[in-house]
Amino acid sequence: MKSNRGSNSRFKLLAFIVAFAVSLLASMAAAGPASAGQSHHRTWQVQVGSESRDQAIQGMQFLPSEIFINEHDTITWEANSAEIHTVTFLASGQPLEEFNPFSDDELLKRGGDSYDGHSYYNSGLLANVDVPGFPDARSYSLAFPREGDFTYYCLVHGMVMKGTVHVREQGTDYPYSQADYDKSSRAEARSILRDGRELTRDLADQATSHMVIAGGDDGVAMVMRFIRPTVTVHVGEKVNFVNTGMGAPHTVTFGNEPANIFAPSGDPWHFSGGDLNSGIIPPQGTFEVTFKATGTFEYICALHDYMGMVGKVKVVD
C-alpha cells in the first residue's frame, strides 16, 4: 500500500521543524531573551504527544521538540495524549531498537531524577488516561546538572519521535521563555491535527468493503481508527485488514481478548465466530480473514480500543 503521503513524509517532518523554528524566532523578536539570573533554577514543561478531542488523531511529536535550558534546570514532560509514549535517553553507544512491550526497562521508570549525561534514563510509559494492560504515568521530571546537547526518544515510536535538550552554562540568558514554547507548541499541535484529518481522508479513499485500513500514520500524525469500520461481505468472502502506517502497531481482535494480545490465535481461514486475534500487525502488515458464517462480528484493536478503535463485519448469504 504505497501512496504519495508515504513518499513525502520526510518533507512533512522537515516542514514542521522549520515552521516551529520560525515561530520561535518570531516570539523571540517580539519579547526578547529571558534573563536567567544567577541562582534561580527553572522548571520547564514539554508536552508529550497531542490528540484530537475524540482521540482519533494522535500526534507523534514532543512539543517543543527542542528546548534550551541552563545547568541545574529541570524539565517536566507532561502526557498529552491517550497514546502511550516514553521519554528515553539512551546510554552512550546504545542503539535505538524496536519497542519491546515485555521489557520492564522500557515499560517502567529507569534512572534517577538527575541526568548524568551518559546513562540510560527512561520515564516509563506516559499517557493522559489509564491504559488497559499497561503501567503508565502522567508526567516525568528530570534535572540537568551538566552542559551538553542531549537527544531523547519515544521508544514506542522510534526515530520519528525524538527531542533535544540543549543545556548551557548556568546564568546564560534564555533565548525563549516558557510562553514562547507554549505558543509555538499550540501552533504545531494544530498543524498535526490538520495533517491527521488529511491522512484520514486519504486512507478513506483506499478502503473498500473487502479492505479495511487498520490505522495509519505518516511520521507526524496517527489515525487510531479502522477506516470503513463497518463493512458487509458475503459468506466465503475475505476481508483484508491493512496497517498502512510507519510506526504504530495494531491488532484485529474478535471475541474475547487473549491473555497475550501480541500473539496470533484462532483460525482466520475459517472464521464462523468466537475468538480470533491477529497478534501484532506491524506497520505495512496485513491480516486476512475468511468469513464462513452469516452474522455481525464485532472486533477491536486490543491496543487502542479505549480510544475508540473498533469495528464490525456484517456477513450475509
Locate each region found by the language model.
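Bacterial N-terminal signal peptides
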Residues: 15-27
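N-terminal secretory signal peptides that target proteins for export/translocation
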Residues: 1-12
